[in-house]
Amino acid sequence: MIDRYKHQQLRIGLVSPQQISAWANRILPNGEIVGEVTKPYTFHYKTNKPEKDGLFCERIFGPIKSGICACGNYRVIGDEKEDPKFCEQCGVEFVDSRIRRYQMGYIKLACPVTHVWYLKRLPSYIANLLDKPLKELEGLVYCDFSFARPITKKPTFLRLRGSFEYEIQSWKYSIPLFFTTQGFDTFRNREISTGAGAIREQLADLDLQIIIDYSFLEWKELGEEGPTGNEWEDRKIGRRKDFLVRRMELAKHFIRTNIEPEWMVLCLLPVLPPELRPIIQIDGGKLMSSDINELYRRVIYRNNTLTDLLTTSRSTPGELVMCQEKLVQEAVDTLLDNGIRGQPMRDGHNKVYKSFSDVIEGKEGRFRETLLGKRVDYSGRSVIVVGPSLSLHRCGLPREIAIELFQTFVIRGLIRQHLASNMGVAKSKIREKEPIIWEILQEVMQGHPVLLNRAPTLHRLGIQAFQPILVEGRAICLHPLVRKGFNADFDGDQMAVHVPLSLEAQAEARLLMFSHMNLLSPAIGDPISVPTQDMLMGLYVLTSGTRRGICANRYNPCNRKNYQNERIDDNNYKYTKEPFFCNSYDAIGAYRQKRINLDSPLWLRWQLDQRVIASREAPIEVHYESLGTYHEIYGHYLIVRSVKKEILCIYIRTTVGHISLYREIEEAIQGFCRACSYDT
């Protein structure tokens, strides 16, 4: 839930009926408790004022105008001398009208109803906890059949003590023959349970720790059995094991969060504050109302009817009561999620009513559009492009975006360095884009991380921190390895950039949100910063080299420069020797001077490593020199031996691309080792 002072956290979950009552109930100065909505009315058609105990009641939700009660009396808000603080005639407190944005009410349901999110949504949490098929639970909730209620230490007519056996509908026709009407009602209320009340009884009797222990024991037994050889049976066992794992995780979550399973069955239905479901008067005197008001009215109408059947008339047939309970359940289902059970409810113009789920979910819902998607200061947006020369923790920020985001910091820097006398002069320098501006901007950005976010933010890697650097152009540059965490592509995707202002936010960005600290997937633990797409193609081109071996390369006339434009004469053709280099720096220098190509084969001097030499491999060629030394040429390496056959040096056959990749890997390993040595 939200802290009332700092507003730093939000938790969404199940609440107890006591908590709902505590949110909605208010004690007036005269000791009267208000909060329950009992009437389905909104405004009086003559006075245009909210109906008492209705959906817009001022006693429950507060006054429409600050300090003015329903009678029209006025009191100064917060004045201790003014007494009393509420109107004794209408019972409305003299408080600020903004209370109608957060003051809730509740409807006391005449029968328990299941929360449709936890029954019908997949996976069904109620079905998982009770380990029963969803269709049977739906039939029980909507009064299609019943089960025998066990009664401890009492004799039962059905003699099914301690068991929950579902009965077919024949009990409605066979069992009543043994009773009078009054006797059958007593028997049904005592030994038969149906509707959401039956679900609530079963959930209340659950021991979550026993569920975890038994589920683990069954999962272990299924794992020890091994495959049966029957593909259908093996799939069935696999599905059962997956279900047991989900059931254990669900039970652990209930224990960890101190939530009782029976809270998934509602006894009190919360009523939203009136300002969140308004009625607006438009031109011509017509009224526009939120769809939720109509759905609330439907619930109250049916609930009041059920209350009358249960309290005023003792001779009401049980079938009629069960039918009315089903109607109340369906009305609450429509309020929470219209259309989840089939055809949605529509108005007179054949328009589907927007339920509570429709209001909060989706791209246009309350969270994504109003709370998460709203415009904020110190933020910008632009297209992302690949920045292969960037470090993993850096991003390229265009100058136009950077100067706008860090404008206040640049102004402070200009004034501190006495380059501007006041804010107006500093803004003038920024508009004229003087060279000193970019120098100060560089200094400001060096120690200030930024947050990059790509919508939709489906997991925590959807927003990460980077160290910004200035780049030319109008696009944000990103390292290609962070693409997968954002689920982004460099084909026109846009990302938002935010500047953390407080020291706490900057510390959190540096310690938890930097991209080089989020290399593993938080869901499964696998590496998420892995080469994909362009990087794989680049690595392939870098390390492909020539496909021809040393022999084919030697006598292939295609090695001659400009061979397409010259006449090939095999008799006058001379082989161009593959160059020798003492170290990788000389090889890369030759490539930069365009003396060799990226995939040109070359000989690179290597350390005396016996692992390079194949013991049983015969040399392809042996070259002797005048001093007695000779070269043994193999497929991928070359050995220089002395007169005494001692190894003087070894050369390996490689390319500039392989050398570049090796140097990058070696540098990364050395950096990792240095970091580990610092930690120890």
Swiss-Prot record:
UniProt keyword annotation of Metal-binding present: yes
Binding site for Mg(2+): 489, 491, 493
GO cellular component, one term: DNA-directed RNA polymerase complex
Intrachain S-S bonds: none
Keyword list, A-Z: Chloroplast, DNA-directed RNA polymerase, Magnesium, Metal-binding, Nucleotidyltransferase, Plastid, Transcription, Transferase, Zinc
Catalysed conversion reaction: RNA(n) + a ribonucleoside 5'-triphosphate = RNA(n+1) + diphosphate
Names of the cofactor(s): Mg(2+); Zn(2+)
Primary site of residence: plastid
EC numbers, comma separated: 2.7.7.6
Key word Cell division present: no
Gene3D superfamilies in alphabetical order: 1.10.40.90, 2.40.40.20, RNA polymerase II, clamp domain, RNA polymerase Rpb1, domain 3
Subunit structure comment from the entry: In plastids the minimal PEP RNA polymerase catalytic core is composed of four subunits: alpha, beta, beta', and beta''. When a (nuclear-encoded) sigma factor is associated with the core the holoenzyme is formed, which can initiate transcription.
Role description: DNA-dependent RNA polymerase catalyzes the transcription of DNA into RNA using the four ribonucleoside triphosphates as substrates.
UniProt record similarity statement: Belongs to the RNA polymerase beta' chain family. RpoC1 subfamily.
UniProt protein name: DNA-directed RNA polymerase subunit beta'
Gene: rpoC1
